[in-house]
Curated annotation (Swiss-Prot):
CDD domains: RlmH-like. GO terms for molecular function: rRNA (pseudouridine-N3-)-methyltransferase activity. Keywords: Cytoplasm, Methyltransferase, rRNA processing, S-adenosyl-L-methionine, Transferase. It is found in: Cytoplasm. The keyword S-adenosyl-L-methionine applies. Belongs to the RNA methyltransferase RlmH family. S-adenosyl-L-methionine binds at L63, G92, L111, S112, P113, L114, T115, F116. This is Ribosomal RNA large subunit methyltransferase H. It is an enzyme of class 2 (transferase). InterPro entries: Alpha/beta_knot_MTases, RlmH-like, tRNA_m1G_MTases_N.
Length: 144
């Protein structure tokens, strides 16, 4: 996984300082990975903002409760399959993503069968991206 070929689009702001610090920690470890915050609104307006921010050459990965749930090693392997593509991970607002955006996604991903606040999901995603990179590169961060 090449962090400079990945980005995260997330609806809403991170309001908890400790979550923001965690996100910043992993972003420093993944140079090139960016997070773009989109304004909270109605699901339809959020979907319009997301679509406007998407680039034609990106593979859309929608984070959603009903998505595919993988362990860290299978997640790393799956990301490796996309290594030559530009990836955009999308985290919707409190009401999630619209049905149209979910269908537009090339991969529907769930971070867990549990439900988490969206700002915490953002932290979990950047940590898992770092973990996936360490698994693929054979670095000792992941201990299983």
């Amino acid at each position: 996984m090449n962090p400079s070929r990945c980005r995260i689009l997330a609806v809403g702001k991170v309001r908890r300082d400790w979550i923001q610090k965690g996100i910043e920690l992993y972003l420093k470890r993944l140079p090139g990975l960016t997070v773009t915050e989109l304004r909270d609104s109605s699901p339809e307006k959020e979907a319009d903002s997301i679509r406007a921010a998407l680039r034609p050459d990106e593979t859309l990965i929608a984070l959603m409760e009903q998505g595919e749930c993988l362990g860290s090693i299978p997640f790393a392997r799956r990301l490796k399959q996309f290594e030559n593509e530009r990836l955009v991970f999308v985290i919707g607002g409190a009401d999630g993503l619209t049905a149209e955006l979910k269908l537009q996604a090339q991969w529907q991903l769930s971070l867990s069968p549990l439900t988490f606040p969206h700002e915490l999901a953002r932290l979990m995603l950047v940590e898992q991206l770092f973990r996936a990179q360490s698994i693929v590169q054979g670095r000792p961060y992941h201990r299983a």
